[in-house]
């Protein structure tokens, strides 16, 4: 929706100041262009070349709100994704508010791992139940629904506000009839699925409490603490998932979580020590960081 126009001359003056604000505060100037692509009719190339001084610029947000929004990004470290109200994740446009964690690019690999590990699945197994525990924005649930067109995906979160966003994302991306939403803690709302689930995927809170204060201000000040705080050692939620998942997964069912740097060996050892898992694997992200751990329940 058009919210008015601004002259190229006025815009160019403000843009130069906004770039200097970014540089002075250690913010990538590309974030300014990203915001302006969402809030004006300017495209990436035009912004990169700064080829806008001699034209009128159409606005999708009011000129006052654009200026105020950028000040908020710089001064309050408020994430651009929250300002825009959306982010790109895999092939999806995901709505985000500060009720949900912003889906990270590295988390996209969690779906690649699922696809690789299940490329040889029979059609009957592909039609089974899949679960995204701690769904947040619903991004992983969308990835699972796209990967397994015949499956029913269950998205669980303890936050009603997060589930409302996840439901909206399912509708926006045409998966409203393929994903069921459940409010509660981890497996709690899925008692009716004991022994029936083909796979569980989760990006649980995994930051040790002592390290929360060291997170970037964009994260610790604005993203939900519930999605970050992993307890004293960061593995509080992961340990629950290890302990409880065999009750719900089928024999040979798939288990996959995202974790932080340095946690993979501990998670693998916890899986081994439980005696309930086989085929335990550690997977690296694109930066070669051990980011994911997968396993299967005993057959």
From Swiss-Prot:
Binding, substrate: 203-206
Keyword annotations: Methyltransferase, S-adenosyl-L-methionine, Transferase
Catalysed reaction, written as an equation: L-glutaminyl-[peptide chain release factor] + S-adenosyl-L-methionine = N(5)-methyl-L-glutaminyl-[peptide chain release factor] + S-adenosyl-L-homocysteine + H(+)
Taxonomic superkingdom: Bacteria
EC number: 2.1.1.297
Single Gene Ontology MF annotation: protein-(glutamine-N5) methyltransferase activity
InterPro entries per record: DNA_methylase_N6_adenine_CS, HemK-like, RF_glutamine_MTase_cyano, RF_methyltr_PrmC, SAM-dependent_MTases_sf, Small_mtfrase_dom
Binding, S-adenosyl-L-methionine: 134-138, 157, 186, 203
GO BP terms, alphabetized: methylation
Transmembrane annotation, as ranges: none
Function: Methylates the class 1 translation termination release factors RF1/PrfA and RF2/PrfB on the glutamine residue of the universally conserved GGQ motif.
Entry's family note: Belongs to the protein N5-glutamine methyltransferase family. PrmC subfamily.
Name of the featured protein: Release factor glutamine methyltransferase
